[in-house]
Amino acid sequence: AVAPVHLDDEALLRAQVNNLFLVNDSAGACPHIRTAIRKSHDIFWQKGLIFCQALSGEHDRAVLGVDLMREQGMDADSVFFKLVGSLLGEWEGKIDSLSDPTALQLAMARAGNLRLPSDVTQTRNPALLAAIAISPNADPEIRLAAAEKAESAGTLSTESLRQIYASIEFTSEELESALTTAEAIDGPRGRALLLRTAQVQDVPTAQAEVLLAFLASARDGGLYETAAYVIAPTLVEMAPAAELIWFAEEAGRVLIFTGALEQAMGWYDLAEQESAGIPEAGQAKARLWPLILISDPEEPTPLDGAMP
């Protein structure tokens, strides 16, 4: 149930209405809008009322509201008028650009089943990004681009992001040459391809190579932390082995960062065992130990030779 909000706090009421729009609860938002419009003629409430009238079949009232807005010179928001026109059956077309969307615009586009343009993911609003990520009227790759950013901002769960990654479709040719294809296409789709490949790969060295590429791509995109949480369950199940010593440092870092310290110690132990004869192992040992110590100050593993 929606908690009542005093109308003298219009900003709070507006935030509540926007939140309802973002969770696809326009039916819950409209009663608040109809109440608010009695005390405020702010453009936000006028647009909201027109949307609610269109949703409830009050065609004539919605048209009148649009006409009044235009008479008052409030016709700068061309996207709004297109969205209203679509809901009223008076406009057919597509939204070419929506780089700075509002919660109302997203709700209207969803109600009218209008496809969201690719630039909609340029918004920096985490709540809007989360809404875009779960919008059925957005193409899968647009949803994924928004989902990566939303997870990074904390407004979308990691599991939801994994599910959106899994929804991306690929050709058999792309799947057969995942590493080279992912490098060519890069970005969210490339990462989705790498993740799909890693999850079905049963050769540990090949799986590690793909996971390393996934992390590298995410790092380049400023999404390393997000990527770490996405692949953590896979790494927890991966057994440290001598043939994977080149992967020990990266695997250990991800596991430490995501709180899987016990599994991270397995990679540290591997690096320690191989450090005498393999410089790469010694480097992994030296770099992982301070991270382990910070994560668990009571860890009894000796420091001998661990620090660079």
Each model region followed by its residue ranges:
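Solenoid-like repeat scaffolds
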Residues: 3-8, 33-42, 67-76, 104-108, ...
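Extended ligand-binding clefts on enzyme/binding-domain cores
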Residues: 85-206
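Generic helix N-cap/helix-start motif at coil->alpha-helix transitions
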Residues: 5-15, 39-48, 60-61, 75-82, ...
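Structural motif corresponding to the intra-repeat A-B loop/turn of tetratricopeptide repeats
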Residues: 23-24, 56-57, 258
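Extended amphipathic alpha-helical segments with heptad-repeat/coiled-coil character used for oligomerization
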Residues: 28-123
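Helix-turn-helix repeat elements of alpha-solenoid scaffolds
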Residues: 1-2, 20-30, 186, 218-230, ...
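Residue-level signature for tetratricopeptide repeat
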Residues: 15-22, 52-53, 254
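Small-residue-rich helix-loop
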Residues: 282-308
